[in-house]
Amino acid sequence: MIRYLTSGESHGPALTAIVDGLPAGIDITQNDIDSQLLRRQQGYGRGGRMTIESDKAEVMSGIRFGKSIGSPITLLIRNRDWENWTTTMARFEEPVEEIAKISIPRPGHADLAGRIKYGFNDIRPVIERSSARETAARVAAGSLSRVFLKALGIEIGSYVSAIGSAAEPTVNPAVEELLVNGAECLALEADRSSVRMLNKSAEAGAIAAIDEVKKQGDTLGGIIEIFITGVPMGLGSYVQHDRRLDAMLVSALMSIQAIKGAEIGHAFENSRKPGSQVHDEFFLSENTGLERKTNRAGGLEGSMSSGQTIHLRAAMKPISSLVTPLHSFDLETMKPTLSRFERSDTCAVPAAGVVAEAVVAPVIANALLEKLGGDHFIEIKSRLETYRDHLHRTFKA
């Protein structure tokens, strides 16, 4: 089982991730990790932090001569901004008097509940760990599972379908055309846009909307669509709640900072229709075996992969740190005041898509390992080929 933990504060010396359970024998390059970190830093509407950081992962363990060796992989990403925070984020020194305590929580953020939960007299520790800066470590960690999956013919990609009210067409033929060549083809096309949109009109509308809210000191959220191609039928299980693949994928998406909703396939649209207009019918073909003409279920049925492309959707709220303040109060004086501003992005929806790709990768990798077993890439690949051949023969009978 692949599992990972991240550590580090937004303005501490570094972020770290320890990835345990990755099989041995997987070819991994430095670029496999750093290219994903670079993608995360892109996107129209990002804040000043992205001009400071240039994220690179230092591999401290678990890889030898370009291959995973089965032991925990430790990744370290240094924070260049740390040099400006050595006093505020000092680890052992006594706090100096000029460091002001933060006592005014921002609505929509972890500030208030985090301060109360952990008994702090300063909101700063909450801000540091709840920050989406942490996702850099998760993108690095997820890149390892992503490499593993791609070597087995499974690809992950995403694009942004809406930022604010600027939205892609509900039916976009370009998506299906790109997915024919794998989900990474879709992601590469999306990456050509500064807002990771496929439709030029929607892209222009999103950029204009970001510019407008930035002038107003406001922020924007949006919707990201995630696709996973090449997943064989039968991953996950209906037998127990904690083995349901749909639940694990949605949980992974909901773990991303500022994600407030997740959907599989056309779930909410399907809820308004009769079953005869929702369920994806089976058709048998002498040439290809089992066929389906629709994928409204998003590649998941009965909590298991159906063999179709997995389609997920996630909704990101507008970022909680606003230049134009909202009503708040001071925890020290218990008097009303306006909320404070912490350096942030105007819109981080494009980056959230990259993070979403990263967090679903270990989920799919674990479902595959649960089905196939194995400790070395070669034996896992052999078992997957055998299983795929079995599926092919089953539906060609």
UniProtKB/Swiss-Prot annotation:
Q: What is its EC number?
A: 4.2.3.5
Q: Which InterPro entries match?
A: Chorismate_synth, Chorismate_synth_AroC_sf, Chorismate_synthase_CS
A GO cellular component annotation in the UniProt record: cytosol
Would the keyword Methyltransferase turn up in this protein's UniProt record? no
Q: Where does NADP(+) bind?
A: R40, R46
An MF annotation (GO) of this entry: chorismate synthase activity
GO biological process entries: amino acid biosynthetic process; aromatic amino acid family biosynthetic process; chorismate biosynthetic process
CDD domains documented for this protein: Chorismate_synthase
- Keywords from the named record: Amino-acid biosynthesis, Aromatic amino acid biosynthesis, FAD, Flavoprotein, FMN, Lyase, NADP
Similarity comment: family membership: Belongs to the chorismate synthase family.
Task of the protein: This reaction introduces a second double bond into the aromatic ring system.
Q: How does it assemble?
A: Homotetramer.
Q: Which NCBIfam families match?
A: aroC, PRK05382.1
Q: What is this protein called?
A: Chorismate synthase
Q: From which source organism is this entry?
A: Chlorobium limicola (strain DSM 245 / NBRC 103803 / 6330)
The gene is aroC
